[in-house]
């Protein structure tokens, strides 16, 4: 039961941050920038914490709270997919491709940067 509460509490804060970021950051160049930012941020945090746990200790409770709960609610593949599909429906092919490339490769890059940052941290 404790694990579920930790995930739920982390998810509560991650969902609120996602809502705030998506509401504050406007669409730029026809790309849903808020979704991109939360996906990049969440990917960096996950990369940093996963690789930090290789060099230091990260308790199961922190992993559940931050990685599963917070980052799980912060990042959103379903919203990214819906926004990309909607862009395709409106025939924004170039912007859709750019959105997909930025999200996929940007998030992969952020996991890598998080990994590098964790090496310097520990």
From Swiss-Prot:
Its main location: membrane. The keyword Protein biosynthesis does not apply. It is a multi-pass membrane protein. Na(+) binds at residues 72, 75. InterPro entries: FluC. Pfam families: CRCB. GO terms for molecular function: fluoride channel activity; metal ion binding. Na(+) is not transported, but it plays an essential structural role and its presence is essential for fluoride channel function. It is found in: Cell membrane. The chain crosses the membrane at residues 4-24, 36-56, 65-85, 100-120. Coiled coil: none annotated. Keywords: Cell membrane, Ion channel, Ion transport, Membrane, Metal-binding, Sodium, Transmembrane, Transmembrane helix, Transport. Fluoride-specific ion channel. Important for reducing fluoride concentration in the cell, thus reducing its toxicity. This is Fluoride-specific ion channel FluC.
